[in-house]
Amino acid sequence: MSNLQTRIITAIVLGTITLWLTWVGGVGFTLFSIAIGLAMFYEWTELSATRQTAFSRLFGWAWLIVTGILLILDRGALLTIGFLVAGCAILLVTQWKSGRGWPAAGLFYAGFSALSLSLLRGDEPFGFTTIVFLFAVVWSTDIAAYFNGRALGGPKLAPRFSPNKTWSGAIGGAAAAVTGGLLVASLVAAPGGWGVPVLALLLSIVSQIGDLAESWVKRQFGAKDSGRLLPGHGGVLDRVDGLVAAAALLYLFGAIFAEPDVPSAIFFSF
């Protein structure tokens, strides 16, 4: 089987599972979000192995699992976030000499990603629409950036650590994200105005920053891929870096302007 065939099969399987669990929501999607976070943490600790100790690994795994349990038990967003931040603070203080901020950053990155995705979906119907909106924006960004960049070329976006990305791709991805976001909003009869396109544009920008940041991390440790968990695609971090960055921003918007436990209420609750 060729690498392209493997990539296609993996993408179809993962896409089907993702969309089905997004539709189901509830505990199923929460478990899916936690699984993403655990995979991210595993790859982060492997990438930054030279900055990890036995304690940082064991502590990080244990703290992340308990964070996931708090999510499943629905103990409240603020409590769960507070617990996660406390764990990161402990790692930052105890592991600074050996790991600088890498162990703490990995725990927060994985934990907050799982939390953001899970709480954005929740059990509410508008949670489903919010996640679909997020997917549409991020996937439109990725696809359009790739093809637009290849077709038009031009100046590199960040040649030092992501030599294949171009400004033409980034701009094309942002334009596609706005279009994708508006399409989802129109399907649920969202009110007009500037809110949806501006939000889609911001999410697209943050998604691309998340992609670049993950490329920078890999460069720090001389890695081409974040791992080998996804046949034909490399690692989980390689596939979700932009998604979880955008999800974190979307969650923060919802938590600030609606409420931390039901962040999607502000977006598509009409």
UniProtKB/Swiss-Prot annotation:
It catalyses: a 1,2-diacyl-sn-glycero-3-phosphate + CTP + H(+) = a CDP-1,2-diacyl-sn-glycerol + diphosphate. Its EC number is 2.7.7.41. It is a multi-pass membrane protein. The keyword Cell membrane applies. It comes from the Bacteria. It is an enzyme of class 2 (transferase). One of its GO terms (cellular component) is plasma membrane. One of its GO terms (molecular function) is phosphatidate cytidylyltransferase activity. Signal peptide: none annotated. It is found in: Cell inner membrane. The chain crosses the membrane at residues 19-39, 53-73, 76-96, 101-121, 126-146, 183-203, 248-268. Pathway: Phospholipid metabolism; CDP-diacylglycerol biosynthesis; CDP-diacylglycerol from sn-glycerol 3-phosphate: step 3/3. GO terms for biological process: CDP-diacylglycerol biosynthetic process. Pfam families: CTP_transf_1 (PF01148). Keywords: Cell inner membrane, Cell membrane, Lipid biosynthesis, Lipid metabolism, Membrane, Nucleotidyltransferase, Phospholipid biosynthesis, Phospholipid metabolism, Transferase, Transmembrane, Transmembrane helix. This is Phosphatidate cytidylyltransferase. It comes from Brucella melitensis biotype 1 (strain ATCC 23456 / CCUG 17765 / NCTC 10094 / 16M). The lineage of its organism: Bacteria, Pseudomonadati, Pseudomonadota, Alphaproteobacteria, Hyphomicrobiales. The gene is cdsA.
